[in-house]
Regions:
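N-terminal secretory signal peptides that target proteins for export/translocation
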Residues: 1-6
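Intrinsic structural disorder/low-complexity segments
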Residues: 7-8, 375
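Short amphipathic alpha-helical "recognition" segments used for binding
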Residues: 8-11, 415
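Bacterial N-terminal signal peptides
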Residues: 11-20
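Active-site neighborhoods and metal-handling regions in enzymes and metal-associated proteins
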Residues: 26-455
Length: 455
C-alpha cells in the first residue's frame, strides 16, 4: 500500500503518524501524552450529530458490503424494551436509551446491492429508517412484519442467534418463536444465524471512526499520565485505590463512561513476582521505589478503548528510572513488535498467538499474550489472540481470521529479572489500542515506550 492509499483510508493525520514513527532509533510509534486536557471532549448534546453521522455512514457504506460478504438477503434485529439486543444501539440514531415496546429493524439487500432500512415499530425511529407499519396493537405489528418479509421474498434471512458469540445472540427465545409463528413454513425455513454479519459489523471500522479513534485513545492515555504524576500521587500517603478513584472521577468529570472500574496496583522490591504467576502486583500505600500499573477503559462517540501503562516512583536521590526497569520496558516493546509483526489478513487469532509465542520463546522472553478486538464494545467480537489463562488455541473465537480496518487491544505482559532488585522479576503489563489496516498495525495514539515517573 502506498502513502496516498494509506492516507485515503486513514486520513492524513493517522497516516503521517504511521509513516513517520518507524524511522526513529527508539521503539517505533512511541508517544508521550501528558494530560487529557490536551484533547477536546464534546458535551453530551454535541455528541449526537457526529454519532448519528457515523451510524449513517456505516449503514450506507459498510452494511451493504458486509451483507453481501456474509450472503444474507435480509437481516432482522428484533428486541424489547429493557431486553435489548447487544447490536441494537449500534444501529439506531441518538439520543436513544431503550427499545420502545417491541422494536423491529429490517434490513433488505436488493438486487442492485443497496440495502433498504425499515422499521416496524409503534414509535417510528425516523432517519435513517423508513417506517413500514402504520400502527396498531402487538398482534398487528407481528402480522405486518410477516407480510413485509413475504413481500420482499428474501432467500436467506439472518437472525441474531448464536451458540458461541454472545453479541450475536440477542434474539430472545420468545421473540424467535413468535417470528416463526408469523412466517409461512417456507419462509421460516429460510431463517439462518446472522453471527458472521454481526461480528463483521461490530469489528469493522469506518473512515470516520478511524479519523476520531486516535483522539479517543489519546484522552484515555492522558488521564493515565495525570494519575501517574505528582499531581495525584504523594508517596507515603496516596494509595493505589486513591489513584483508581482519581481515574474514575476524572473520566466522570469529562462525561466519559468507563466500561470497567480502573485497576491500579504496585510491585515492590522484596515482594516476589514468581515466574509462573499470571499476574503480579498488590494494593496499598504507594512508596518510593514502587512500580505502578493501571488498566483503564472508556467509551466515547460509541468507540471504546482499553489501555494499560506502567509508572515508577523514584527513590530519594534517584535521577533516572533504574536501568533494569528501562530494559524491561524495551523488552515489553519488543514483545509487542513480535505480536503485531505476526498480524496478517486471513490469519487466525490462534495462528498469530502460536507465532508470537514461538518468537518470544526464541528470544528468551517470558511473555503471555491475551489480545482482543476493540470497537463498540471493550471486549469486542473478532479474533481472540490468547487468553491470560490459556496460552494455547481458543476454539471458535481463536479461529476467527483477521480482517483489514479492525482495531485491537494489543495486550499481554512480560516478566524480566531486575538487577537493581537482586534479580527479582518485574511484570510489565502493557496494552494499547491499535488499528490493523490489512498490512500492518498502527497504534492509534502511539504506545508507551518510556516510564511514567512520579516526581
Amino acid at each position: 500500500m502506498n502513502t496516498q492509499q494509506l492516507k485515503a483510508i486513514l486520513g492524513a493525520g493517522l497516516a503521517t503518524l504511521a509513516l513517520t514513527m518507524t524511522a526513529s532509533a527508539e521503539p517505533a510509534q512511541g508517544r508521550v501524552i501528558e494530560s487529557a486536557d490536551d484533547f477536546a471532549v464534546l458535551s453530551t448534546r454535541e455528541r449526537v450529530e457526529p454519532e448519528n453521522r457515523m451510524v449513517r455512514e456505516r449503514l450506507e457504506t459498510l452494511l451493504p458490503r458486509l451483507m453481501a460478504e456474509t450472503d444474507l438477503d435480509m437481516w432482522l434485529v428484533i428486541n424489547r424494551e429493557y431486553a435489548e439486543d447487544p447490536v441494537y444501539f449500534t444501529l439506531v440514531p441518538q439520543p436513544s436509551f431503550a427499545a420502545r415496546r417491541t422494536t423491529m429493524l429490517v434490513f433488505h439487500r436488493k438486487a442492485d446491492g443497496t440495502v433498504d432500512r425499515l422499521s416496524v415499530n409503534r414509535y417510528p425511529l425516523g432517519e435513517p429508517y423508513q417506517s413500514a407499519w402504520a400502527g396498531g396493537d402487538l398482534d398487528a405489528q407481528w402480522k405486518a412484519l410477516g407480510e413485509l418479509i413475504v413481500s420482499r421474498n428474501p432467500k436467506r434471512i439472518g437472525v441474531n442467534v448464536s451458540r458461541e458469540w454472545p453479541v450475536a445472540d440477542g434474539l430472545t427465545a420468545a421473540l424467535h418463536d413468535r417470528l416463526r409463528e408469523v412466517l409461512p413454513t417456507e419462509f421460516a425455513a429460510r431463517l439462518v444465524p446472522a453471527e458472521s454479519l454481526v461480528i463483521r459489523w461490530l469489528e469493522t471500522r469506518s473512515q470516520s471512526e478511524l479519523a476520531v479513534y486516535p483522539h479517543i485513545v489519546g484522552i484515555a492515555r492522558g488521564v493515565i499520565a495525570e494519575a501517574f504524576s505528582s499531581r495525584v500521587i504523594t508517596p507515603g500517603v496516596t494509595s493505589t485505590q486513591d489513584v483508581a478513584w482519581y481515574i474514575r472521577q476524572r473520566f466522570e468529570s469529562l462525561g466519559l463512561p468507563i466500561w470497567f472500574f480502573p485497576d491500579v496496583n504496585r510491585q515492590r522490591q522484596g515482594v516476589p513476582c514468581e515466574a509462573d504467576s499470571p499476574f503480579c502486583g498488590g494494593s496499598g500505600v504507594i512508596e518510593p521505589g514502587d512500580v505502578l500499573h493501571t488498566d483503564v477503559g472508556i467509551c466515547y462517540l460509541k468507540l471504546c478503548t482499553d489501555t494499560q501503562e506502567m509508572g515508577y516512583v523514584p527513590r530519594l536521590g534517584e535521577v533516572e528510572v533504574p536501568a533494569g526497569l528501562q530494559a524491561a520496558m524495551q523488552t515489553g516493546n519488543r514483545w509487542q513488535d513480535f505480536l503485531t509483526g505476526n498480524f496478517a489478513t486471513g490469519r487466525s487469532g490462534n495462528d498469530v498467538l502460536s507465532r508470537t509465542r514461538a518468537a518470544a520463546q526464541k528470544a528468551g522472553i517470558n511473555a503471555s499474550v491475551y489480545t482482543h478486538a476493540l470497537g463498540m464494545f471493550g471486549h469486542a467480537p473478532g479474533p481472540t489472540i490468547g487468553m491470560w489463562d490459556n496460552q494455547g488455541p481458543t476454539a471458535v473465537q481463536g479461529d476467527w481470521p483477521l480482517y483489514a480496518s479492525t482495531v485491537y487491544a494489543i495486550e499481554g505482559n512480560i516478566k524480566q529479572a531486575i538487577p537493581e532488585w537482586g534479580g527479582q522479576f518485574v511484570q510489565m503489563k502493557l496494552e494499547q489500542s491499535a488499528l490493523f489496516d490489512g498490512e500492518r498495525v498502527i497504534y492509534l495514539a502511539g504506545r508507551q515506550t518510556s516510564w511514567h515517573v512520579v516526581r
